[in-house]
Structure formats: structure tokens, C-alpha cells
């Protein structure tokens, strides 16, 4: 209920537009790193032969339910090497869990290692250090039968001198007249935009910015094209 599949339709359509623009029409091969439950990917599998990676077996089971034809691997996107090439690499929400520049660099190197020359890499950080003026609060209420869920997301940066931030989720669950409250705390990365572009360049990508919207909110995707010679 927190992140239903249909909530990804708008954004996934814009990822699909970029892939169509960048790739030669064919049954191209794509790899999603950190696929999670596979909601975003589920809107792309009709046009692409997809493979997906995640560290969590539970997430992979959820992904399998809505993406039954996708090849799945349990592994860390910073280190995995599948030994073959793809036409495009995608990293959606999972990129936020990279906590250091070394994490980012290793992940970008993974993307480059799995791409054909001229292949496409798409990712999109939620926040940049330069433009995050927290705390930020988002909330939403959803209902399903007798169950009502309200969740509140509180994002803040306790120490602007480091590369991490915290996101706290509070869930207010009402069912049959009873209220249950649960909390979940996530530690995520927060980097200057220039660091993203610099590290992608170091991994061998030329980078362009593509603005998309999700729920009416503008959001930047970084689209990298793999060069034959890595940039220093």
C-alpha cells in the first residue's frame, strides 16, 4: 500500500521515453541494479529483455510476482559481475543507499562493466547536497477495504559535513477501529551534484541531464552514455 505499482506509471513512462530515444529499435537487453519490488521495471519489460539484481531475497520474491519473465540475481550492485553486456543499465531508488563516494564509484564501475560501447546508464538521486534544505516532510493516506494507512516521511541531514542523511518513516495503520504505529529509519547518501557527474565521468560516461516529473514534482535523471575510453 505504501508504494503501489500504479504509483510508478508516470515516472516509468518517462524512463521508457529516454530508452526509446537512446537505443536502436530492437529487443534490447536491460539490467536493473537494486530492483527492489520491480515496480518501475514492470512498465519496461514489454519492450526489453530484462535482468535484475537486488541484495534482498524478499524484494526479489516480490519482483518475481510482477515480473515473472525477468532473470533475477541476488547480489550487491557495487560488486556484481555477470560476465555479459547489456544495452542499458538502470538504477532507480536503490542508488540512495550508496553512502560514500567510493560506493558510488564502485556502482558506476559496475554499470560500465556491463554495458556495450555506447550503452546507456540511467539513474536519479532523490536529493543533492547543494539543493537539500531540510527537513522535508511528505505524507499520504491510502485505503484498501477496512485497512487505512497513513505514512509520514521525514528527511533531514543531521551533519552537512558528511555524505549521509536520514529518512524516518512513520506508519499509522488503522484496521477495525484499532490504530497501530510503526517506525522505520533509513540512512541514505547525500552528495553534491558535481560529485555524481564527476564520478560518472571517471567511470567512462558522458552525462546529460533529463528532467522528469513524478506526481507533479520535477526530478532530475542523470543519463550516461558509455564512452570507449574512460575519462580521468
Question: Locations of the language-model features?
Answer:
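A short acidic, Gly/Pro-enriched loop at the edge of an enzyme's catalytic core
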Residues: 78-89
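SAM-dependent methyltransferase
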Residues: 125-194
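C-terminal lobe and adjacent flexible extensions of AdoMet/dcAdoMet transferase-like proteins
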Residues: 187-232
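Class I SAM-dependent methyltransferase SAM/SAH-binding core
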Residues: 38-79
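Conserved beta-strand signature within the Rossmann-like core of class I S-adenosyl-L-methionine
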Residues: 118-125
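Conserved class I S-adenosyl-L-methionine
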Residues: 1-36
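A short glycine-rich, Lys/Arg-flanked "PGG" loop and its adjoining helix->strand segment in the class I
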Residues: 105-117
Amino acid at each position: 500500500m505504501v508504494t503501489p505499482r500504479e504509483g510508478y506509471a508516470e515516472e516509468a513512462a518517462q524512463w521508457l521515453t529516454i530508452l526509446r530515444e537512446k537505443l536502436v529499435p530492437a529487443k534490447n537487453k536491460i539490467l536493473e541494479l537494486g530492483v527492489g519490488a520491480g515496480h518501475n521495471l514492470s512498465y519496461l519489460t514489454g519492450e526489453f529483455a530484462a535482468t535484475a539484481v537486488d541484495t534482498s531475497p524478499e524484494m526479489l520474491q516480490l519482483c518475481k510476482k510482477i515480473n515473472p519473465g525477468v532473470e533475477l540475481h541476488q547480489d550487491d550492485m557495487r560488486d556484481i559481475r555477470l560476465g555479459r553486456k547489456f544495452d542499458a543499465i538502470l538504477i532507480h531508488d536503490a542508488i540512495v543507499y550508496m553512502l560514500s563516494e567510493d560506493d558510488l564509484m564502485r556502482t558506476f564501475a559496475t554499470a560500465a562493466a556491463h554495458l556495450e560501447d555506447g550503452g546507456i546508464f540511467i539513474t536519479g538521486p532523490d536529493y543533492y547536497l547543494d539543493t537539500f534544505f531540510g527537513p522535508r516532510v511528505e505524507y499520504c493516506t491510502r485505503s484498501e477495504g477496512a485497512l487505512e494507512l497513513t505514512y509520514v516521511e521525514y528527511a533531514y541531514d543531521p551533519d552537512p559535513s558528511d555524505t549521509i542523511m536520514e529518512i524516518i518513516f512513520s506508519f499509522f495503520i488503522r484496521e477495525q477501529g484499532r490504530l497501530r504505529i510503526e517506525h522505520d529509519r533509513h540512512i541514505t547518501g547525500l552528495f553534491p551534484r558535481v560529485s555524481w557527474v564527476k564520478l560518472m565521468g571517471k567511470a567512462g560516461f558522458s552525462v546529460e541531464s533529463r528532467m522528469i516529473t513524478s506526481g507533479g514534482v520535477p526530478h532530475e535523471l542523470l543519463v550516461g552514455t558509455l564512452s570507449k575510453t574512460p575519462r580521468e
